[in-house]
Amino acid sequence: MGGRSSCEDPGCPRSEGRAPRMGCVKSRFLRDGSKASKTEPSANQKGPVYVPDPTSSSKLGPNNSNSMPPGFVEGSEDTIVVALYDYEAIHREDLSFQKGDQMVVLEEAGEWWKARSLATKKEGYIPSNYVARVNSLETEEWFFKGISRKDAERHLLAPGNMLGSFMIRDSETTKGSYSLSVRDFDPQHGDTVKHYKIRTLDSGGFYISPRSTFSSLQELVLHYKKGKDGLCQKLSVPCVSPKPQKPWEKDAWEIPRESLQMEKKLGAGQFGEVWMATYNKHTKVAVKTMKPGSMSVEAFLAEANLMKSLQHDKLVKLHAVVSQEPIFIVTEFMAKGSLLDFLKSEEGSKQPLPKLIDFSAQISEGMAFIEQRNYIHRDLRAANILVSASLVCKIADFGLARIIEDNEYTAREGAKFPIKWTAPEAINFGSFTIKSDVWSFGILLMEIVTYGRIPYPGMSNPEVIRALEHGYRMPRPDNCPEELYNIMIRCWKNRPEERPTFEYIQSVLDDFYTATESQYQQQP
């Protein structure tokens, strides 16, 4: 195994799995499960009390029949894992290990598994997204499990990769099949990514072109490293694989306020402030502090439990809460801040149109997941999208708008209500649905393509309401392609049922520049 990048960007798309599981793509072959809970808080416990994650479905323990899969035999190949990265224990019950170390898994549930080192015989908890089954494809540098074609392109076009950088990934369309993605360059489009379907033989082998067949994917990779043999490029090095974010601490859902050290104020909104903080001296987080009285603790906890269950790599991950007023919401830290601030910054204002389209596609992917889960955001705008160091966009504050009790916000004519982003039926009748989110997404597209300009420039809220009633829609900016503006206009249909689904919007934005081309290269 070659050396992996030591980057540990919390926003890296590869650092987390797709919904509804948590962990990086490396952990997506796991069964659904809970965080390991080793100690329940008791009434007479001294010191800070940590309340376990209420969304956990099971607890680990010696009598837990679900802690390992059926047919579990300790020490069998199924239970031996190899470390993909170094891990230094940050809790007393954790097990430190070096990349390449082998361990036998004793209990598994969710993000933390109990394991024993084969070398030292020590036992402890390990982050499941730092290991892979021994002799599995996940141990190969070039294999990216569960990654989409679009995210494969984002990875391969990221800094640190070169001509011929490649990955093999699961096929999105054919279960049990694979695709090869390769970084290429052509004078017309610049840096691009080409995709090749890897087909299977009845005998169990693999091929891209029937002229060359291989007994394993490893053999296939070695062959195309020697020469391109019909591919766009000879394979050079595996795609850079950033170190995934460590899973959140076990049993830490409702946490004590003193476990957070506030370090830098990042911004202030209508209902509180956002801070960069350190949790328990070892994990950088973002903390949203809610003004006392802005929502009831009971309503917040109920909504937070629901928000916690929405796990997707284009949604900001909710880690923990402080449930006494003032309420604190603890999430993953996103280095570039809000998309609105980023677009107005020097770096953001230089982003080319294809990157702006990519931001839009990422947000639509997260909203398509919210749509699929029958959830509603209610406050979708650039200020509520966060951006990671590697320019991954994630949706924040989903669901919070529903439980805010501030009259200036709940009264739809109030000064704090985001009129310019809100669908007419939500303004007039309080009818919030996924289709009113689609309207807001159209406004968000306009924010993105104008680099953070306020919608309906020069118009007051009452003027916007009157204009919309008379059929007014914002005109197309000069730099906005007709195809993108057409999406906005469809999002702003008067009748909610005539607006497109987020699933459809995502499909259009993902292939915005390649809709007329085959996504996969044809082999002779």
UniProtKB/Swiss-Prot annotation:
ATP binds at L266, G267, A268, G269, Q270, F271, G272, E273, V274, K288. Keywords: ATP-binding, Cell junction, Cell membrane, Cell projection, Cytoplasm, Cytoplasmic vesicle, Cytoskeleton, Exocytosis, Golgi apparatus, Immunity, Inflammatory response, Innate immunity, Kinase, Lipoprotein, Lysosome, Membrane, Myristate, Nucleotide-binding, Nucleus, Palmitate, Phagocytosis, Phosphoprotein, Proto-oncogene, SH2 domain, SH3 domain, Transferase, Tyrosine-protein kinase, Ubl conjugation. Subject to autoinhibition, mediated by intramolecular interactions involving the SH2 and SH3 domains. Kinase activity is also regulated by phosphorylation at regulatory tyrosine residues. Phosphorylation at Tyr-409 is required for optimal activity. Phosphorylation at Tyr-520 inhibits kinase activity. Inhibited by PP1. Its EC number is 2.7.10.2. One of its GO terms (biological process) is innate immune response. The modification Phosphotyrosine is found at Y50, Y207, Y409, Y520. GO terms for molecular function: ATP binding; non-membrane spanning protein tyrosine kinase activity; phosphotyrosine residue binding; protein tyrosine kinase activity. Residues 29-38 have a biased composition (Basic and acidic residues). Residues 142-239 form the SH2 domain. It is found in: Cytoplasmic vesicle, Secretory vesicle; Cytoplasm, Cytosol. Disruption phenotype: No visible phenotype, but macrophages have impaired phagocytosis. Mice lacking both HCK and FGR are extremely sensitive to infections by L.monocytogenes. This is Tyrosine-protein kinase HCK. The lineage of its organism: Eukaryota, Metazoa, Chordata, Craniata, Vertebrata. The gene is Hck.
